[in-house]
């Protein structure tokens, strides 16, 4: 395994650990989730470049689309919670139900 792949896997692992440690705050969880998605994007891009298969070249773009949708929904929830309660705790998500 090359050092590049090890660094990307280390970045994913650190983001996953951050997600587990700061799971009560929505903003920190969203930042860790973005770090995980970016490391996955870099990994899939490197794999697509190394395999040179035309079928796998679209995979990083699909991953970026899902990451953008995840970020938009997460930020909408963050704004809704912070406007309603003034805090970014994840346990406030249950209070947004009708």
Swiss-Prot record:
Q: What is its EC number?
A: 7.1.1.2
> Which subcellular locations apply to this protein?
Mitochondrion inner membrane
Q: What does this protein do?
A: Core subunit of the mitochondrial membrane respiratory chain NADH dehydrogenase (Complex I) which catalyzes electron transfer from NADH through the respiratory chain, using ubiquinone as an electron acceptor. Part of the enzyme membrane arm which is embedded in the lipid bilayer and involved in proton translocation.
Name the membrane topology term.
Multi-pass membrane protein
Please name one Pfam family that this protein belongs to. Answer: Oxidored_q2
Q: What are the alphabetically sorted keywords of the record?
A: Electron transport, Membrane, Mitochondrion, Mitochondrion inner membrane, NAD, Respiratory chain, Translocase, Transmembrane, Transmembrane helix, Transport, Ubiquinone
What organism does this protein naturally occur in? Answer: Macaca maura
Q: Known InterPro entries for this protein?
A: NADH_UbQ_OxRdtase_chain4L/K (IPR001133), NUOK/Mnh_C1-like (IPR039428)
| Catalytic activity entry | a ubiquinone + NADH + 5 H(+)(in) = a ubiquinol + NAD(+) + 4 H(+)(out)
**Can you tell me which family this protein belongs to?**
Belongs to the complex I subunit 4L family.
Q: Which GO terms describe its molecular function?
A: NADH dehydrogenase (ubiquinone) activity
Subunit and partners: Core subunit of respiratory chain NADH dehydrogenase (Complex I) which is composed of 45 different subunits.
Cellular component terms per the entry's GO annotation: mitochondrial inner membrane; respiratory chain complex I
Where does the sequence pass through the membrane?
1-21, 29-49, 61-81
Kindly report the protein's main subcellular placement as a broad class. Answer: mitochondrion
* PANTHER family, sorted: NADH-UBIQUINONE OXIDOREDUCTASE CHAIN 4L, NADH-UBIQUINONE OXIDOREDUCTASE SUBUNIT ND4L
Q: What domain of life does the native source organism fall in? A: Eukaryota
Q: What is this protein called?
A: NADH-ubiquinone oxidoreductase chain 4L
Q: Write the lineage as a comma-separated list.
A: Eukaryota, Metazoa, Chordata, Craniata, Vertebrata
UniProt record, GO biological process: ATP synthesis coupled electron transport
């Amino acid at each position: 395994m090359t050092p590049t792949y090890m660094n990307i896997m280390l970045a994913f692992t650190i983001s996953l650990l951050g997600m587990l440690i700061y799971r009560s705050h929505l903003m920190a969880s969203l930042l860790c989730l973005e770090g995980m998605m970016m490391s996955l994007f870099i990994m899939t891009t490197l794999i697509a470049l190394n395999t040179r298969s035309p079928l796998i070249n679209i995979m990083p773009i699909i991953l970026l689309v899902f990451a953008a949708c995840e970020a938009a929904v997460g930020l909408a929830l963050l704004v809704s919670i912070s406007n309603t309660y003034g805090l970014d705790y994840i346990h406030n998500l249950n209070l947004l139900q009708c």
